[in-house]
């Protein structure tokens, strides 16, 4: 079938900000789709609210709208651009839900817009729990016994009939939001209440739990001619009961017999044909390990996280081909871009094994509930490729960057028996390490299978790894065992520990027997056809398939898995750096291990190595490629941390030298540099012990800001107001010693300002100055950033430009740097300098039209800013106003405190842009998912230090028609200022308390500032958590509340009676 010529313009809906359950995989899918449609000659209009994505670059579509993905804004874009069709299946759950909303509101009919890929009936059949169950019954496909419920009474009735445990699956939600396994009435009440709130159609499916069955996924494709094929089948190591996004996954499946494989393959193809999906689809199935019985769990009628994994695991570009199928092309007429000779209907064949391990953010959230269930909690994932499951698994473990280079975690090895049993029977994020610890202590694989229902095959493979460990320890420096260990995926670092030598000694031992990895190509066809894909993985075999080209090359280190503090912004910079290297005439090589991202799409770079970002693995690639040098500025802290080891091995680090990077990151060296440059910073010192920290804090005066040196994302950072709190921090948050000092600074409560700049060593370009709405003390990644800065005087701006220029040249920065300042009146202090790309670089690149990573890379390669066409100094400011608003995933992470402070908590960001600050903020808030009520009730409960400021806010809220509710202390302050307020009871008082009002939906906004002490038993924690669970916006900073208020004021009209001044409002009390 030829492609359709009756449509000219296609609207692609993106997935919005990164949240748990919907991450960088949709930037990858959206980028592929936009380019694929443009390649076919269509005019592409894109809407997405996330500025940190490649897909929102101007080159990706004919028209790019960085606007909220809401019915209001998408309808406006449709009316303006008049697309012939929309493609919603590449924007995750956001895209699907948006298409359903547009249809229900009549917009698609009104504007005559067709839905491509998967029609709305199919989306409804797959997403609506009742329609899906009916379709499966029609097809004769088994689904677990279930019932659709809309309230708690219906849930009780179902449980009475079939008993516990039951699984709750809300309709139309993402990453299992609001769902879970319930073993008793208390869990049922919590989960069903949450699920009904989060489901846009107030509907949940309650089903009999089949926890313990094997979970298997099939990634399938179908075209308009009803050709259908399987791209990849994957097996979850964890059985049913743990969300697939939180499971360790292997591809292809390892434990299915041919009969089982074919049975489930046929079911998957039958389902995609019945749904008449044109494009990609993910089918999840549960298989009884003791029979051929199976159940269909669910179907995602769209490109998903699993599609990204399947694409990278096989090399088959699902999203790219799904876009082509959506416009009428068929699988047998689209060439497979990997081989260039075969067509897309050939099912990929793998002659290797792929392992995926999720990456969690529990290092950031110590209070979080780490237990895994049907609601996803991972922020990202890593993938590794090997010739055996053992090799792929160990490579994936060391890709995680959790301080483990092997299946060995101190906490697991030192755990007492009770903890070990609990961690094995009730899975948490680190269960793999506890399984290894149990095997080391002599538990059998049969015992572990009984407790976990993990297939014996995987446990046997794990036990073989432990056995090999023992043989390694018993035979130091044995060459045969060394070769066997390397083939099984063991790292040099772990072998060095076993043999009590340093890592270099292991390397020398391998060099003596020429024991080095070779690189194999990922080609989709197990070498059956000729292939030239520049996509490689390492293994210890004979034949090497990667050859060095005659062209000079540059290696760019990626940023690894997505986690809080190091998100998709760094992948964005990596991709732009690669493009700049190619433009400069070099071969660009990427090393990375994140299957979700654009950088690991093999068509981006000249060569892609899918490898762990460890010194050993990176050095092997460098030895084979012999590059001109390595770029570490764009891979976040991951890449920066490798620079020292690489330089010691004689590798040229391009851009800012290692010594100068250290001068910016090492406290004492940085202080000396500031002294020479005569740039002020808040008073502070480095402490190497608890006593020293107390002395420093006493000298400079509380409050103080304490943090370990060398951190990204403000990890273990806190504002401390007393000696007692400082002792608590020093003993609980950090392991302080001379090797790992702690920084103690005077806390300046001023206005925080952030600058990204590019330096060629002589000239310094500052694309823009951003101010934060929240004052210093809230992490820059969690603050609302505004460009151009609205509250800075000309003098302050000039000072910032002067200091930035002096810092860049004084620290010999070549490439990018990010500086954070705090402004107190007209005084400017420097807080920190990061000699690398930053979280704000994509945002600033988009709005100033200066492609920062691209320009910085050209500078790193030796060009200067003036020759590249840039004038040094501050670039001319734009007329429009842009805001970057953080987005949080608190709904997924129960028991995490939502209060903002120096430790970063946001998972993503959105952008708002308009002609006034209020309009830009409105767009930003709406895009971030904040519900903006024009009237309602504000609950104020603030710390004593904030009461004076809260009075002004309350007056303004009252003026535009909001009712004010407050707890006793805050209410008294407001009453004294003659503000009408309803006093509510605190938690624990026996009458109706503020928690009841929150639960009953009587509150529309909560403003709650932190009393000192972070322990969750405090009332504030409960207020904040309840608000999140009930979908009520919470401000833990008065600055954020003031920003929301500004927006509401700009949307309201003045309503005053002519004789208003004569009448005093009575006080009311609830």
UniProtKB/Swiss-Prot annotation:
Region (Carboxyphosphate synthetic domain): 1-401
SMART domains named among the record's database cross-references: CPSase_L_D3 (SM01096), MGS (SM00851)
Annotated positions binding Mn(2+) 1: 284, 298
Binding, Mg(2+) 3: 820, 832
Residues noted as binding Mg(2+) 2 in the record, renumbered to the chain: 298, 300
Positions of region (Oligomerization domain): 402-546
EC number: 6.3.4.16, 6.3.5.5
Residues holding Mn(2+) 3: 820, 832
Any one of the GO BP annotations: 'de novo' UMP biosynthetic process
NCBIfam families noted in UniProt: CPSaseII_lrg, PRK05294.1, PRK12815.1
Role according to the record: Large subunit of the glutamine-dependent carbamoyl phosphate synthetase (CPSase). CPSase catalyzes the formation of carbamoyl phosphate from the ammonia moiety of glutamine, carbonate, and phosphate donated by ATP, constituting the first step of 2 biosynthetic pathways, one leading to arginine and/or urea and the other to pyrimidine nucleotides.
Family, as annotated: Belongs to the CarB family.
Identification of the protein by name: Carbamoyl phosphate synthase large chain
Organism this protein belongs to: Listeria monocytogenes serovar 1/2a (strain ATCC BAA-679 / EGD-e)
Lineage: Bacteria, Bacillati, Bacillota, Bacilli, Bacillales
């Amino acid at each position: 079938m030829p492609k359709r010529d009756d449509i000219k313009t296609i609207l692609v809906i993106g997935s919005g900000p990164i949240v748990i359950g919907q991450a960088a995989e949709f930037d990858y899918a959206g980028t592929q789709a936009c380019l694929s449609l443009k390649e076919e000659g269509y005019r592409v209009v894109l809407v997405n609210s996330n500025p940190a994505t490649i897909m929102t670059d101007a080159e990706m579509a004919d028209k790019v709208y960085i606007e909220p993905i809401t019915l209001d804004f998408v309808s406006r874009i449709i009316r303006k651009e008049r697309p012939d069709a929309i493609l919603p299946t590449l924007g995750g759950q956001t895209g699907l839900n948006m298409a359903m909303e547009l249809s229900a509101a009549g917009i698609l009919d009104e504007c005559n817009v067709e839905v491509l890929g998967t029609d709305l009936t199919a989306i409804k059949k797959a997403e609506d729990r009742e329609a899906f169950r009916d379709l499966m019954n029609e097809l004769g496909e088994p689904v677990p016994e279930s019932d659709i419920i809309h309230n708690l009474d219906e849930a009780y009735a179902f449980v009475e009939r079939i008993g516990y445990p039951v699984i709750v699956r809300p309709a139309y939600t993402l990453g299992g939001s609001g769902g879970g396994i319930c073993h008793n009435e208390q869990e049922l009440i919590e989960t069903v209440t949450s699920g009904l709130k989060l489901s846009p159609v107030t509907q949940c499916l309650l089903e009999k739990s089949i926890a313990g069955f094997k979970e298997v996924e099939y990634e399938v494709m179908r075209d308009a001619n009803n050709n259908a094929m399987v791209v990849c089948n994957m097996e979850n190591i964890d059985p049913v009961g743990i969300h697939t996004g939180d499971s360790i996954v292997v591809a292809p499946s390892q434990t299915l017999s041919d009969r089982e494989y074919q049975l489930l393959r046929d079911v998957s193809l039958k389902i995609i044909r019945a749904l008449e999906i044109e494009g990609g689809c993910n089918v999840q199935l549960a298989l009884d390990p003791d029979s051929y019985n199976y159940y269909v769990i669910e179907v995602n009628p769209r490109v998903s996280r699993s599609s990204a994994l399947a694409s990278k695991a096989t090399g088959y570009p699902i999203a790219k081909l799904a876009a082509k199928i959506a416009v009428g092309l068929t699988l047998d007429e689209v060439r497979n871009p990997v081989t260039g000779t075969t067509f897309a209907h050939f099912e990929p064949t793998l002659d290797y094994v792929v392992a995926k391990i999720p990456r969690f953010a529990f290092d950031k959230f110590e209070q979080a509930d780490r237990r895994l269930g049907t609601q996803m909690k991972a922020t990202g994932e890593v993938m590794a490729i090997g010739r055996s499951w053992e090799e792929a698994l160990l490579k994936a473990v060391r890709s995680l960057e959790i301080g483990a280079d092997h299946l060995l975690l101190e906490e697991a090895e030192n755990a007492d028996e009770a903890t070990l049993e609990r961690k094995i029977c009730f899975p948490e994020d680190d269960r793999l390490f506890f399984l290894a610890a149990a095997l080391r202590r002599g538990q059998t694989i049969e015992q572990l299978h009984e407790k976990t229902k993990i297939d014996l095959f995987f446990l046997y493979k794990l036990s073989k790894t432990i056995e090999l460990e023992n043989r390694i320890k018993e035979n130091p420096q044995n060459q045969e065992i060394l070769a066997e260990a390397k083939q099984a995926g063991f790292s040099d670092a772990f072998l060095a520990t076993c043999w009590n030598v340093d890592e270099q000694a292991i390397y020398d031992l391998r060099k003596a027997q020429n024991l080095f990895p070779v690189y194999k190509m990922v080609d989709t066809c197990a070498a059956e056809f000729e292939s030239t894909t520049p996509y490689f993985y390492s293994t210890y075999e004979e034949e090497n398939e990667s050859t060095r080209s005659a062209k000079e090359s540059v290696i760019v280190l990626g940023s690894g898995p997505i986690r809080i503090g190091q998100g998709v912004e760094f992948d964005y910079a990596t991709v732009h750096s690669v493009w700049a290297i190619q433009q400069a005439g070099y071969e660009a090589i990427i090393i990375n291990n994140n299957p979700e991202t654009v950088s690991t799409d093999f068509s981006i770079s000249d060569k892609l190595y899918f490898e762990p970002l460890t010194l050993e693995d990176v050095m092997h690639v460098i030895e084979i490629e012999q590059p001109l040098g390595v770029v570490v500025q764009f891979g976040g802290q991951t890449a920066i941390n490798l620079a020292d080891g690489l330089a010691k091995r004689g590798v040229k680090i391009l851009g800012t030298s290692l010594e100068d990077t250290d001068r910016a990151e090492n406290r004492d060296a940085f202080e000396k540099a500031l002294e020479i440059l005569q740039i002020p910073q808040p008073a502070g010192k480095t402490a190497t012990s608890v006593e020293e920290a107390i002395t420093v804090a006493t000298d400079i005066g509380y409050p103080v800001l304490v943090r370990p040196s060398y951190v990204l994302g403000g990890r273990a950072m806190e504002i401390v107001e007393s000696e007692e709190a400082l002792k608590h921090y020093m003993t609980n948050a950090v392991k302080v010693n001379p090797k790992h000092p702690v920084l103690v600074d005077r806390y300046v409560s001023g206005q925080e300002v952030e600058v990204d700049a590019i330096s060629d060593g002589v000239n310094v370009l500052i694309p823009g100055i951003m101010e934060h709405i929240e004052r210093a003390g809230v992490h820059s990644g969690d603050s609302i950033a505004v460009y151009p800065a609205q509250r800075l005087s000309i003098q302050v701006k000039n000072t910032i430009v002067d200091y930035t220029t002096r810092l860049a040249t004084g620290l010999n920065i070549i490439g990018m740097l990010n500086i954070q300042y705090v402004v107190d009146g007209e005084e400017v202090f420097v807080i920190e300098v990061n000699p690398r790309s930053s979280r704000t670089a994509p945002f600033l690149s988009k709005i100033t039209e200066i492609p920062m990573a691209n320009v910085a890379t050209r500078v790193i390669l030796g060009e200067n800013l003036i020759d590249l066409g840039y004038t040094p100094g501050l670039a001319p400011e734009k007329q429009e106003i842009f805001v970057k608003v953080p987005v949080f995933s608190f709904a997924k992470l129960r028991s995490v405190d939502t209060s903002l402070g120096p430790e970063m908590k946001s998972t993503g960001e959105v952008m708002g842009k308009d002609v006034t600050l209020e309009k830009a903020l409105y767009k930003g808030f709406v895009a971030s998912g904040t519900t903006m009520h024009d009237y309602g009730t504000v609950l104020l409960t603030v710390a004593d230090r904030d009461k004076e400021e809260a009075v002004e806010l309350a007056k303004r809220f009252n003026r535009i028609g909001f009712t004010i509710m407050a707890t006793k202390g805050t209410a008294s302050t407001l009453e004294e200022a003659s503000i009408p307020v309803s006093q509510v009871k605190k938690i624990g008082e026996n009458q109706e308390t503020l928690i009841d009002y929150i639960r009953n939906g009587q509150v529309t906004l909560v403003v709650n500032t932190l009393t000192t002490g972070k322990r969750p038993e405090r009332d504030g924690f409960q207020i904040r958590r309840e608000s999140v669970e009930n979908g009520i916006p919470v401000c833990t900073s008065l600055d954020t509340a003031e920003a929301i208020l500004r927006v509401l004021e700009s949307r309201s009209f003045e309503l005053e009676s002519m004789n208003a001044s004569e009448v005093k409002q009575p006080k009311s009390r609830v």
